[in-house]
Amino acid sequence: MPKTSKDVIEFAKKNNILFYDFRFTDIKGIWHHVSYHADSVSEDILKGVPFDGSSIAAWQPINQSDMLLIPDLDSLFIDPFTADPTLVVFCDVYDIYKKQPYEKDPRSIAKKALKYLAESGIGDAAYFGPENEFFIFDDLKIKDEINAQSYEIDSTEGVWRS
């Protein structure tokens, strides 16, 4: 994989990449992204992609909303599901006002936790991942009439069954 910004540009050209998709998650785990056409991506932008942090719920006030996405060049891959060849790059969020990684960025939080784990000696490894929560319904009845709408859910896992 490419290790420098110059290598990334060359890799993209060799693979006929049309778009770069810079991705990050908010504190709630929701994916966000900023996309650029390949013609507008330079080595400089791969050092920091500007974006408006006030557009992310509970992140930044409008008067201090300028933030940077710092691409993690070890994470890039060509997205197999896009119609046009797209290079995906996961990013760390950087607070330009405090000149440090953003404290609400899940990647920054995980890196701090790993650093603490190593420095304190309380553990050798940490594993992070999403927690998938869902319910399985055994039956669903829907009523949708001009004068009434309702639904009824039944599940062997429901509290009304215990």
Q: What annotation goes with each model-predicted range?
A:
Residues 1-162:
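Glycine-rich, acidic/polar active-site loops that bind/position phosphate-bearing ligands
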